[in-house]
A protein has these predicted regions:
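Surface-exposed short loop/turn segments
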Residues: 27, 69-74, 78-126, 134-145, ...
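Compositionally biased, intrinsically disordered linkers/stalks adjacent to structured regions
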Residues: 147-170
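Second-shell loop/turn segments in exported
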Residues: 45-52, 141-149
Length: 170
């Protein structure tokens, strides 16, 4: 009886282990690569009235690089299993803090992108939403002196937000 019980337990464990699928990801993505193999990332045009020239290419390249570095998805020009598209809708600066003399002490720079995400294999995950990133700098500095650094910082934050919403699903 002990031997039959042991064999039954062993067969049950084997059946459970082969029926269960465990997937570990150390990069934050939550992708079933047996179903999702490709991603299509369109260029995001700038639709903002205020523009900094390098912002568009910087954003588009960083977004593609983010997916390339953090997933095994193959980037394609069309018919991707996942599709990420949208536009840069806002880039602006506004006074943030006031000094004791009544003048602006800090300026906030913000960037907003509208994203349309399509999962052709699981349409219930499709969405369209806006993501915003901000950065603050002292008014004693000129925008031209800090713009590249701040836009790069905001682009990284936006790419993280988009990645998390699309494939990490946090």
């Amino acid at each position: 009886m002990t031997r039959a019980w042991f064999v039954g337990l062993l067969l049950s464990c084997a059946a459970i282990l082969t029926a269960c699928k465990v997937s570990y990801s150390f990069n934050g993505s939550n992708i079933d690569y047996s179903v999702i193999k490709t991603i299509q990332i369109a260029d995001f045009p700038i639709r903002s009235s205020y523009v900094w020239g390098p912002m568009g290419p910087l954003f588009n390249n960083q977004l593609r690089d983010h997916y390339a570095n953090h997933t095994k998805l193959i980037q394609v020009k069309r018919n991707g299993d996942l599709k990420v598209e949208g536009e840069i809708t806002q880039y602006q600066q506004r006074n943030k803090g006031v000094s004791s003399e009544g003048y602006s002490a800090q300026t906030e720079l913000s960037m907003t992108v509208n994203v349309r995400f399509t999962n052709t294999k699981k349409h219930e995950e499709d969405f369209e939403k806006q993501f915003t990133a901000t950065a603050v700098y002292e008014t004693t500095q000129s925008l031209s002196a800090v713009q590249e650094e701040l836009v790069t910082q905001m682009v990284k934050e936006l790419c993280d937000q988009i990645f998390n919403a699309t494939v990490a699903q946090w």
